[in-house]
C-alpha cells in the first residue's frame, strides 16, 4: 500500500513539474530538466512490466544491479523454437532513467533473434533516451540485463548431463 502511494505521489509530482500551465518550459526545476520526454514517457507508461515463468526452458532471466546507486533490474525474454524473442518483461527498482532503459530494452529485443539481441548496446539505449552522462549507468544495466537473460536462456538449451548420456 505504501509503495502504491509513493508511486502516485511521484507521478503527481512529475505531472506538476512537466505540465503545469503556470510553469513555462524554461522555468522547470533542475530535476525535471534532466529527463528527456522519452524518459518521462517510458517512466510514466512503462512497457512490458511483469514477469515470465523463470522455470520455463524457453525463458531467460537476467538480474543485474548497480551498487553505486542501488538500481536493480530484472529482465526476462521468451524465445520461440526458431530462436526468435517473442516476449520480454522487466521489473526494475531504480530511478526514472533505469525504468525507461528497461522499458525500451524490452521493446527492442522483441522480434529479434537471440544473436541480434546481443548487438544492442548501452550507447544505443542512451542515445535513444537522450540520457545525460550521469545516467549512462542505467543504459549499461539494461545492456547487462539483456546479456544475462540471453546467457541464462542459452544455458537452459544445453543438454543436461543425464540427457546427453542417454542419447
Swiss-Prot record:
Reported tissue expression: Detected in heart, liver, skeletal muscle, brain, pancreas, kidney, lung and placenta.
Location of Phosphoserine modifications: 14
Effect noted on mutating residue 138 to A: Does not affect ISC complex formation. Does not affect the unstimulated cysteine desulfurase activity in the absence of FXN. Loss of iron-based stimulation of the cysteine desulfurase activity in the presence of FXN
Single annotated GO MF: ferrous iron binding
Positions contributing to Zn(2+) binding: 71, 95, 138
A GO CC annotation given for this chain: mitochondrial matrix
Residues at the active site: 69, 138
Post-translational modification: Phosphorylation at Ser-14 is required for ISCU protein stabilization in the cytosol, whereas dephosphorylation of Ser-14, due to the inhibition of mTORC1 (mammalian target of rapamycin complex 1) complex, leads to degradation of the precursor form and ultimately to a decrease in the mitochondrial mature form. Cysteine persulfide is reduced by thiol-containing molecules such as glutathione and L-cysteine.
PANTHER family documented for this protein: IRON-SULFUR CLUSTER ASSEMBLY ENZYME NIFU HOMOLOG
Residues bearing PTM Cysteine persulfide: 69, 138
Keyword ATP-binding appears in the UniProt entry: no
Pfam families in UniProt: NifU_N
CDD domains cross-referenced by the UniProt entry: IscU_like (cd06664)
Gene: ISCU
Site entry (Mediates ISCU dimerization and de novo [2Fe-2S] cluster assembly), positions: 35
An annotated GO BP: positive regulation of mitochondrial electron transport, NADH to ubiquinone
Interval spanned by the transit peptide: 1-34
Identification of the protein by name: Iron-sulfur cluster assembly enzyme ISCU
Consequence recorded when altering residue 35 to A: Does not affect mitochondrial localization. Loss of iron-sulfur cluster biogenesis. Does not affect reductive cleavage of the ISCU2-bound-persulfide by FDX2
Family statement drawn from the similarity comment of this UniProt entry: Belongs to the NifU family.
Effect recorded for residue 140 to V: Does not affect the SDA complex formation. Abolishes desulfurase activity of SDA complex when zinc ion is bound. Activated by FXN when component of SDAU complex
Consequence the record notes for mutating residue 138 to S: Loss of iron-based stimulation of the cysteine desulfurase activity in the presence of FXN
Disulfide bonds: none
Keywords tagged on the record: Cytoplasm, Iron, Metal-binding, Mitochondrion, Nucleus, Phosphoprotein, Transit peptide
Protein origin, superkingdom: Eukaryota
